[in-house]
Amino acid sequence: MDNLFGELRLGSLRLAPLGARRRTKVTASQAAAEYTGRWGWAVATGDPATGTPGSGATAPTRCPCGAARCAAPGLHPVPGGEGRARTGRAEASVLFPTGRAFDVLDVPEQAGLQALVRLERMGTQVGPVLSAPTGRLQFLVAAGTARRLPDLLYRMGWDDAALDLTCHGEGSYVAAPPTVLGGLGPVRWLRRPTRDNAGCPPEARLLLGTLAYACHRGRERTAEPAWIAS
């Protein structure tokens, strides 16, 4: 199993196809309409964080909330923006409120890519996956996962491990495509929602063991030969 967890890069994986409808830039309002009308997901409008364009994942960002060290820059809904997207401004961000239709498992990009390859090779139905420009992958899973996560990790033997793995649940938000996070770039779909998984995201237990292992390996890894996904 270890040989499946060498270094991967985002460009080495098959990205979600654009399709004929996706060849023009999708606006925030168009995306929000799809999320609510087609998939039945709640959305909210957020004030985007600002930063220096093209400055990379380590660039400082300024959150409209005013907190100097905001833990979630740009991920606060504007007043009255809950449950719908008021996206008249081109720079408005679209947010998913988690804990409703789904929760979100959040892992480092490298670990997430490795786990995704492994899961799909095993035939696991992964569900929608977001790629954030902050260097994170976010896996949409069944609602209620955040509440059960400590017990799930305990049952799988990962409760004592220092894993860079979190879960966004009730009361939290994640940025939805095509939201641009200040100075970093847009959020993208690595695996798009489909009719099969949008209304019924996978149970976290189906993904969690592989994700936890990949996160653990990411902390231990020394120089290893790169393995490129075919």
Kindly give the residue locations of the regions a language model identified.
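Conserved phosphate/metal-binding and DNA-contacting active-site motifs used
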Residues: M1-G135, L140-S230
